[in-house]
Amino acid sequence: MLHIVKYLEKLPLLSAYLLDGDVVLLTENAIYATAVHSPYRASINDQNLWLVLYEDLHARGWLEKCDPRISVVTMSEFVDLTVTHDKSITW
């Protein structure tokens, strides 16, 4: 399943619903969780693929602050993710 997270405050809830192999894409204000010292960083685990949208990082001046362990994807790649995952949920 593809989990699209737009709001930081939804990250703690998300962990209860994640299954191994699910993909999480951070967008909009949820990109702030990608900072190495973010209090929300603890919500990001190693059992899932965590991605962040480049356009939102760039728009918020957050490119240099993003944890390098989180993969950055473009809008085009985001579209591809929605095509390859038959189920998605937005948080």
Language model features: what each stretch is:
Residues 4-19, 23-24, 32, 41:
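Histidine-anchored nucleotide/phosphate-binding helix
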Residues 62-91:
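C-terminal structural segments of small proteins and small subunits
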Residues 32-46, 59-65:
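N-terminal beta-loop-helix "entrance" segment that forms/cooperates
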Residues 8-10, 54-59:
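Short, polar loop motifs at secondary-structure junctions
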Residues 1-6, 86-90:
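Short hydrophobic beta-strand segments
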Residues 23-28, 49-56:
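Short internal beta-strands
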Residues 20-21, 47, 85-86:
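Short, well-ordered alpha-helix to beta-strand connector turns
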Residues 21-29, 62-65:
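Short, basic, glycine/proline-bearing loop/turn elements
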